[in-house]
A protein has these predicted regions:
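Exposed alpha-helical structural elements
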Residues: 15, 31, 152-155, 204
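A metal-dependent hydrolase metal-coordination microenvironment
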Residues: 24, 47-200
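Conserved acidic, metal-coordinating active-site core of Asp-based
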Residues: 199-209
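Metal-centered catalytic cores of metalloenzymes
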Residues: 1-50, 65, 74
Length: 209
């Protein structure tokens, strides 16, 4: 009987962990609250010898190979005893509020940022931090307290999204032409793979596969 109860508890935890990656925000929030309420504090306490941390996480709002949402990342950090975590999705701030809230519930100190790529004309002939791409620099913004950008800078995020969508569709057009008759549709095959309509090149690969 004890074994059966333990197995049922494990199955319920596994179900809730899957729900953390639902595209429905309410489902994610309910799942996290349930998991936190059943967590064993002593099993998720950071080690006294070393502080575990990961300050460069990507959620499914840009791309995460395991499909982790911001809430799922925070829960994973709690399970592994992380004291500090940071989210830095590409070109979007969609996961900021959820991540900071989830970290608060999980007892983790969280920070939120954004990662993008810029071209620096002055270094057009030199590699900066993107191997094989002279002039291209991965650029970070850190310390966001909300995903709601002020009106005076909100157009920057809009422009990042526009550029990403144009880049994706150019890639898709070229790959479709090369792989024809194996083709995919941006609206029908790619966008549904994202929770908020911000696909990356990796989503294109997933759609083809």
């Amino acid at each position: 009987m004890v074994k059966d109860n333990a197995q049922k508890a494990e199955e319920e935890m596994a179900k809730l962990e899957l729900e953390l990656n639902s595209f429905d925000p309410a489902t994610r929030a309910d799942a996290l609250d349930s998991l936190i309420s059943h967590a064993q504090p002593e099993s998720t306490r950071p080690s006294a010898e070393a502080v575990a941390l990961n300050m460069h996480c990507h959620s499914f709002f840009s791309f995460n190979a395991f499909g982790h949402s911001p809430s799922s990342l925070a829960w994973l950090g709690k399970k592994r005893g992380f004291a500090l975590m940071g989210i830095v999705d590409f070109d979007v701030l969609d996961g900021v509020d959820e991540f900071l809230s989830a970290c608060g519930k999980a007892g983790i100190r969280g920070t939120a940022g954004i990662e993008t790529r810029v071209f620096v004309p002055e270094y057009a002939a030199q590699e900066i931090n993107s191997p094989g791409e002279p002039g291209v620099c991965y650029h970070m913004g850190i310390g966001f307290s909300s995903g709601r950008a002020p009106e005076n800078v909100a157009p920057i995020l809009t422009d990042l999204g526009r550029r990403a969508a144009e880049r994706n569709q150019q890639i898709l057009s070229r790959v479709n032409a090369y792989l024809d008759p194996v083709t995919i549709d941006y609206e029908g095959d790619v966008l549904p793979l994202t929770p908020a309509g911000h696909p990356t090149e990796r989503h294109l690969v997933a759609a083809y596969i």
